[in-house]
Design a protein with these regions (language model features):
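Active-site proximal beta-strand in glycosyltransferases
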Residues: 91, 107-127, 149-151
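Short His-centered aromatic/hydrophobic patch
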Residues: 94-100
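Nucleotide-activated donor-binding/catalytic signature segment of Leloir-type glycosyltransferases, i.e.
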Residues: 253-273
């Protein structure tokens, strides 16, 4: 079987996906990546990869023109790649939807027997085409109709209300986590990991978000915590951690640090690259994690937090988190940021109760979210689509 994956070839999740796929089945993997080669790896688990690092440089200073035309330029370049490549694939699999991929969808059939798309959740929330979200959703619907399989965690009523024709071709698929595999084998205690990070073992570690993106609302959560009437009684017990390794703004981080210092908070601001071992140590060192992002497609960071038996305080507005509930994971769901902060103070007052509540999460995560386990659903879909390949 020959598969063309379309997505970010630099992504650690993408790399692990391809590696797990090749271990699980006989497949030739080609990758089209609409991003430059960051050279993060000495070698990739792909049989062929093409990095298309074109940017709309000519019009980059004219914001309207760039936003307006760039998806069409990106789609044209992808079309040129397919034509020049001249390969008829068994499957073209769009692992991450960009507005460009919903343009001129019918042409894909010329280069593949089957079309797959993966939806993680964010594609339905914020993307636009010609500066219109509704127009983008209309075009996305046409791409779904063209596709032979829609893979992901979007099997909820809201998604099917909007795209009822997707129901017969929807398949469950989720990325595994190499961090979860490491966590399952770690002998270090939570206190050991705190000390490895330079944090006092008796501190209650509080993680806000899982990247530097402002959509995690680090600033709003922090301000709500320090303004709470109970803050002065617990500030000496807390150590805040901000994992800002990806997509952080310098001024945004500076403002966070100013609030932390003004209120006498102990904290760590992680801005550099983190190895898998370092990420596993961070997860194990986490007592409480806030997940109050504007949107999320069930990030591996959340699954890793659960595997570490951290107490997760999460918003109830994420359409894919039903997967966690269905699997039996225990976490604290809230309707608003204000409620989340109130719940946080209850956790601080009754730590052992909440630690006991989430104690089975590690076993559940280890059983369900290793790459060896998760890749099975993806392999099943591929083999259903191309049984003779």
């Amino acid at each position: 079987m020959r598969v063309l994956l379309v997505g970010d070839a630099n992504s650690i999740f993408f790399v692990h996906y391809a590696d797990a796929l090749k271990k699980a089945m006989d497949v030739e993997i080609h990758v089209y990546s609409p991003f430059p080669n960051k050279q993060d790896y000495q070698s990739y688990p792909y049989d062929y990869v093409y990095f298309d690092d074109y940017l709309l440089k000519k019009y980059s200073d004219i914001r309207f023109v760039s936003w307006f035309y760039e998806p069409y330029v990106e789609r044209a370049r992808f079309g040129r790649f397919l034509k020049k490549n001249g390969i008829k694939y068994d499957i073209i699999h769009f692992q991450w939807i960009m507005p460009a991929w919903v343009v001129c969808q019918k042409a894909y059939r010329k280069y593949a027997d089957k079309i797959c798309i993966t939806l993680w959740g964010g594609e339905l929330e914020h993307l636009q085409l010609l500066r219109s979200h509704n127009y983008y959703l209309t075009k996305l619907g046409k791409l779904i109709k063209l596709s032979d399989a829609v893979i992901g965690t979007m099997a909820n009523q809201g998604f099917f209300d909007r795209f009822p024709f997707a129901k017969p071709i929807s398949r469950y698929g989720i990325y595994g986590s190499s961090i979860i595999e490491k966590l399952s084998q770690m002998s270090e205690t939570r206190e050991d990991c705190k000390q490895q990070m330079g944090i006092s073992a008796d501190k209650i570690t509080v993680v806000l978000g899982y990247s530097g993106k402002m959509l995690h609302n680090h600033d709003k959560i922090l301000n709500d915590i320090v303004k709470h009437e109970g803050f002065k009684d617990v500030v000496d017990k807390l150590h805040f951690i901000f994992p800002m390794s990806r997509n952080f703004g310098a001024s945004y981080c500076d403002n966070l640090e100013a609030v932390l210092k003004q209120n006498g908070c102990s904290y760590s601001m992680i801005k550099g690259y983190m190895s898998d071992d370092a990420v596993a140590c961070l997860r194990k060192a986490t007592d409480v994690m806030f997940q109050l992002s504007d949107f999320d497609g069930l990030s591996n960071s959340i699954k890793e937090c659960l595997c570490a038996n951290s107490v997760l305080i999460s918003g109830d507005w994420f359409p894919t988190y039903h997967v966690l509930k269905d699997a039996g994971f225990k976490y604290l769901e809230v309707h608003s940021r204000e409620e989340a902060v109130d719940v946080f103070y209850k956790v601080i007052e009754n730590q052992q109760y909440y630690y006991d509540l989430v104690n089975d999460n590690k076993n559940l995560a280890t059983q369900q979210y290793s790459w060896t386990e998760c890749i099975k659903n993806w392999v099943k879909v591929y083999k259903e689509l191309c049984p003779e390949s």
